[in-house]
Amino acid sequence: MKNNIITPQYNCNGTFLRKNRSFVCRKGRITKSQLQAIEKYWLSIGIDFKLEPLDFTSVFKNSAPVILEIGFGSGESLVKTAANFPNKNFLGIEVYKSGIGSCLRLAHYSGINNLKIIYHDAIEVIDQMILDHTLSKVQIFFPDPWNKKRHHKRRMIQDFFLIKILKKLNNDGILHIVTDSKEYNFFILNLIQNIDNYINLSKKRMCFEHFKYRLVTNFEKKAKLSGNKIFDLIFKLKK
């Protein structure tokens, strides 16, 4: 498994170009079992980042719909969802190695064969590895809201990002975002309103308080215990 989660870029003078990213590069804690899972299962479940598009039919050995999840954390929800929907393929992207190790371990012991994961920056993966009109759904559950105003530029959900996702969805494709931040919820809704090709499936309610087909994540359980309201934002690609 390659350890670089971003592709270094330099200007003509050789100076490293720093970009605003939605995550902080840090080593963090990783357990022995997570490291062992990476060593044992990465070759069968993981996909190394490459500057070339994926052929999903070749990757999954079938032509079933592909669902992309960005930032899957420990992978518990992603693995359970993949197990519950064996007729769909799942691709997960995560930038923290501990989450990669945890997800690999869970996926192996679940015995599923419809899940692949990538350890890299999601925007680079979307730009370089995902062909247009190949995803049936993109789900982003509890992205970092970067609550301080001066940090809003770090938020993953920006207008340019939503347009990137739009191009990757196939006809009737779905974008599903979940947040426990009321301010981030309205921030996203305001962005979506200025992009013509998204239909808000929640219609007059503007957002779902809960989406019955989504599994509850550990993060969501903690958010509810803290008294936070959960917002499910679901948008469909306009034909």
From Swiss-Prot:
It is an enzyme of class 2 (transferase). SUPFAM superfamilies: S-adenosyl-L-methionine-dependent methyltransferases. S-adenosyl-L-methionine binds at residues 69, 94, 121, 144. It catalyses: guanosine(46) in tRNA + S-adenosyl-L-methionine = N(7)-methylguanosine(46) in tRNA + S-adenosyl-L-homocysteine. The keyword tRNA processing applies. PROSITE patterns: SAM_MT_TRMB. The active site is at 144. One of its GO terms (cellular component) is tRNA methyltransferase complex. One of its GO terms (molecular function) is tRNA (guanine(46)-N7)-methyltransferase activity. InterPro entries: SAM-dependent_MTases_sf, tRNA_(Gua-N-7)_MeTrfase_Trmb, tRNA_methyltr_TrmB_bact. Its EC number is 2.1.1.33. Substrate binds at residues 148, 180, 217-220. Pathway: tRNA modification; N(7)-methylguanine-tRNA biosynthesis. Keywords: Methyltransferase, S-adenosyl-L-methionine, Transferase, tRNA processing. Monomer. Belongs to the class I-like SAM-binding methyltransferase superfamily. TrmB family. PANTHER family: 3-DEOXY-D-MANNO-OCTULOSONIC-ACID TRANSFERASE/TRNA GUANINE-N 7 - -METHYLTRANSFERASE (PTHR23417), PENTACOTRIPEPTIDE-REPEAT REGION OF PRORP DOMAIN-CONTAINING PROTEIN (PTHR23417:SF14). NCBIfam families: tRNA (guanosine(46)-N7)-methyltransferase TrmB. Catalyzes the formation of N(7)-methylguanine at position 46 (m7G46) in tRNA. This is tRNA (guanine-N(7)-)-methyltransferase. It comes from Buchnera aphidicola subsp. Schizaphis graminum (strain Sg). The lineage of its organism: Bacteria, Pseudomonadati, Pseudomonadota, Gammaproteobacteria, Enterobacterales.
